[in-house]
C-alpha cells in the first residue's frame, strides 16, 4: 500500500479548496488504486466522511508528525498556500510540513499551487530552500512560475 499525505487548507468548507481536494483524491485513486490517502484537515471527521480518506487534525504537531512518518509521499496543495501577504505564520506552517517530509526522505510534490506574493526576503529564501528540494512542482498560473524562477526554483 502506497501512503500519500495531502496538506492544504482543507476542512474549512472553502468551496475552491474542497473542489481541489475532491479532484486530487479522485485522480490519485484512479492512478494509484492501491493507495492510502490521509488529509491534514481543520475538521477531520467531516473530511473523512466527505472523501472516504483518513484525516488528522492539521494543527496537532503530534498528528502531523505521525502522518508524515507514515507517508511515502507528501502532496502540498492546491490553493495559494505559499504566500506571506496574510501572514508569514501560514507560509512557515506549510513550509515546515514540507521540510519535515524532506528531512525524513519522503517524496514531496507541490500541486496546483498559486505561489506568492512572497514579499519578505527571509520568506523568499525559506521558500526557495524548501522548494528546490521538491520532487515535482506544478503551479497554476504564470505569475507563480515567474516568482519561482525569480527566487531560483524551476516549475512546470
Name every feature range the model reports, one short phrase each.
Residues 2-119:
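Aromatic- and Gly/Pro-rich donor/ligand-binding loops
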Residues 103-156:
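Active-site-proximal region of nucleotide-activated glycan assembly enzymes
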